[in-house]
């Protein structure tokens, strides 16, 4: 995998505001600060996206996510928290080193983060849903 801005941050070539680090992961403030406390969690073992990340690395990420989330909660007491992970250009991934956004949400904030899901439940009947589920199940 080619070098990314995140690998340079891990190596200390680019400064960051470190939040948490262990042998496997590194968490730091996102420079955009979509909301106060917006943090990124990345594995030190680089992979482009979730499709290329091994289960052991994902285990370390899963262990670190609640540590970082709870630190944000204790620091700022947000009303909620989004954890977002994008895979591929068409899913809005901009740095091709797997990463997780922890975005605190505040009732009174106008944070510019519009995250509204449109529902298609009326357009997809139960038979189609069963076929979709079956197609995915066959590949587990």
Regions found by a protein language model. Name each.
Residues 1-140:
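HIT superfamily nucleotide-processing domains
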């Amino acid at each position: 995998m080619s070098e990314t801005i995140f690998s340079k941050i891990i190596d200390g070539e680019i400064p960051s505001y470190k939040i948490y680090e262990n042998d496997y992961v590194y968490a730091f403030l996102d420079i955009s600060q979509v909301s106060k406390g917006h943090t990124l969690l990345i594995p030190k073992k680089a992979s482009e996206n979730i499709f290329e990340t091994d289960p052991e690395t994902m285990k370390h990420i899963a262990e670190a996510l609640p540590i970082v989330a709870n630190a944000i909660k204790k620091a700022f007491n947000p009303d909620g928290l989004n954890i977002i992970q994008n895979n591929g250009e068409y899913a809005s991934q901009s740095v091709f080193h797997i990463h997780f956004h922890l975005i605190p949400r505040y009732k009174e904030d106008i944070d510019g983060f519009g995250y509204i899901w449109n529902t298609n439940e009326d357009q997809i009947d139960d038979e189609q849903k069963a076929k979709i589920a079956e197609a995915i199940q066959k590949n587990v």
